[in-house]
Amino acid sequence: ETSDELTGAVLAMRNSSIKVKVKTQGHLVDCCGTGGLGKSMMNVSTSAAFVAAAAEVKVAKHGNRTATGKSGSADLLEAANLNLSLKPDQVAKCIEEIGIGFIFAQNFHPGMKYVMPARKRTANKTIFNLLGPLTNPANAKRQSLGVYDSKWILPVAETLKNLGAHKACLLYTSPSPRDTRE
């Protein structure tokens, strides 16, 4: 996929998503990752989102259940007994009042319910691994985004630029400790 193809797919998903309207839009941040690193890797984007919120950054944490690993953001938050079924206005209120709100992807991207079963059946990574972190329904313009393979850093960076991101930090961690890059 090229950055132009990713941009088109992101815009299509964003246009059909249920929006979260946050008053503090200007400095809203999302910490999200593509997943797809395998079963031995842990979810760090959710912890990073809480650290950012503790530092008084407004966080619209967009995430889902795992498709290929041990824990997606939703799996982690569900294990902590948090309500994943918040409506858009409730998520916005959480962001505005406590600094963080969780946007459970399957509740805000209704069309994706047709894709998830196929994603779980395949061992291959798909374009949907890349689209998830780019389709935040609160339209966060600042993002910390992890990718499963370093080859996606430039196309995802170009896609974020195409989408009007104000600031972005792209991360890649290899499953092998000898091949870690930023």
Locations of regions flagged by a protein language model:
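Short glycine/serine/threonine-rich phosphate/pyrophosphate-binding segments
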Residues: 37-49, 69-71, 112, 138, ...
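Acidic, glycine/proline-rich low-complexity segments that act as flexible tails and inter-domain linkers
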Residues: 1-39
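General beta-strand structural signal in soluble alpha/beta enzymes
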Residues: 30, 59-63, 84-88, 102-104, ...
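A glycine-rich phosphate/pyrophosphate-binding beta-strand-loop-alpha-helix module
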Residues: 42-98
